[in-house]
Curated annotation (Swiss-Prot):
Name of the protein in its database record: CCA-adding enzyme
Names of required cofactors: Mg(2+)
InterPro entries: Bact_CCA-adding_enz_type3_sf, CCA-adding_enz_C, CCA-adding_enz_firmicutes, NT_sf, PolA_pol_head_dom, PolyA_RNA-bd
Record-linked SUPFAM superfamilies: Nucleotidyltransferase (SSF81301), Poly A polymerase C-terminal region-like (SSF81891)
Length: 404
């Protein structure tokens, strides 16, 4: 048994000692069968939430009404959820109620896809009542039971299906894909925040180039912020090297580029992304527009962007041109290292010095003067030494006065 399961085994053993059934379930079991890195380990049990909280000394009630308790075991947190069935769903988003049951199979039956409806006992024996292992072997994503019913219960499952295409490289089962096409309008009931979580995982998947065209083919794009009418662009995005991107702002910048978004800020805000992501993606796009080729960076542009942003710009450019970014990254690193200063804080002078030298009250002119100074230093027009900058600034001011 793999270490992540061994570390949680004590929880299952204690539940069993108290007379309850308990199994590993969900994505961790799926990823074990796929040979992928195992993430969070979840446990399903016949014990009621209050039983779980009575058995374990350290628990956190994160949703006992819906059956889930976090058990802290050997310093790690594990979600332990009571076997349950879902009642009727409201607004295509969540069940109105849940019913706790004693059957593992009944619990697995409510899950979204067969590959996620697999359990494993304490000895490593796989319990697979819905053909999840066969779906994994065939590399297909298929719903548990009737696809239309699953998607009408929670419309976000349609986005999850396409997200799993991106993460795993699987294909949608024909009946599953057809049900998404038929029920795509239900996505309008889902909050932007939930859609954004799935979209970010989709963009970060190693097979994003397969998943993005699927948004167009299934019609889901019509109900996603800013993607309506972008079928052609989403299909063309299949040619981009999405796995080359490591940062979320790079992925959103490339999506804007792929879609031909003219104003990135309204588009990104519609996804309710953090301001930092909106600003950084916008800055990357602005640099791409201002700097048409990797070799076109000026010293001023490189200094203003900073090394990390400059590397991101060239990573995004590489993703849509197909030229590996490594050589240009190395050149930019060398160029940045050769700059006499790397930040404005490294200037040998400050605003107080400039005011004292010029003898004028503080005002907007001080920033203009400091900007002129750092540009001159970065371009090698003056050394970053106080006396030399003083002489350069005085000469600049005399020249400007003559020309007035």
């Amino acid at each position: 048994m793999k270490p992540p399961f061994q570390e949680a085994l004590g929880i299952i053993q204690q539940l069993k000692q108290h007379g309850y059934d308990a199994y590993f379930v969900g994505g961790a079991v799926r990823d074990l069968l796929l040979g992928r890195p195992i993430g969070d380990v979840d446990i399903a049990t016949s014990a009621l939430p209050e039983d779980v909280m009575a058995i374990f000394p350290k628990t956190i009630d994160v949703g006992s009404k819906h059956g889930t308790v976090v058990v802290v075991h050997k310093g790690k947190a594990y979600e332990v959820t009571t076997f349950k069935t879902d009642g009727d769903y409201e607004d295509y988003r969540r069940p109105e109620s849940v019913t706790f049951v004693r059957s593992l199979e009944e619990d697995l039956k409510r899950r979204d896809f067969t590959m996620n409806a697999i359990a494993m006992d304490e000895y490593g024996t796989i319990i697979d009542p819905f053909g999840g292992r066969e779906a994994i072997r065939r590399r297909i994503i298929r719903t548990v039971g009737e696809a239309e019913k699953r998607f009408r219960e929670d419309a976000l499952r349609m986005m999850r299906a396409v997200r799993f295409v991106s993460e795993l490289g699987f294909a949608l089962a024909p009946d599953t894909e057809q049900a998404i096409v038929q029920n795509a309008p239900l996505l309008a009931h889902i909050s932007v925040e939930r859609m954004t979580m799935e979209m970010e995982k989709l963009l970060g998947g190693p097979f994003a180039a397969r998943a993005l065209p699927l948004l167009a083919e299934t019609g889901l794009n019509a109900y996603l912020p800013g993607l309506a009418g972008k079928e052609k662009q989403l299909r063309l995005a299949a040619a981009y090297r999405w796995p080359w991107l490591a940062a979320r702002e790079e992925r959103w910048a490339l999506l804007c580029h792929a879609l031909g978004v003219q104003e990135s800020r309204p588009f990104l805000r519609a996804w309710k992304l953090p301001n930092k992501v909106v600003d950084e993606a916008g800055a990357i796009l602005t640099a791409l527009a201002d700097i048409p080729r990797p070799e076109a960076w000026t010293n001023e542009q490189l200094f203003s962007a900073g090394l990390e942003r400059a590397l991101s710009v060239e990573t995004v450019r590489a993703a849509f041109t197909g030229a590996p970014p490594g050589p240009w990254h190395e050149k930019l690193r060398r160029r940045f290292a050769s700059l006499p200063i790397k930040t404005k804080g490294e200037l040998a002078v400050n605003g107080k010095d400039v005011i004292e030298w010029v003898g004028k009250p503080a005002g907007p002119w001080v920033k203009e003067a400091l900007d002129a100074i750092w540009r001159a230093v970065v371009n090698g027009e003056v050394e970053n030494e106080k006396e030399r900058i003083y002489a350069w600034l005085m000469e600049r001011n005399r020249t400007r006065e003559k020309n007035c």
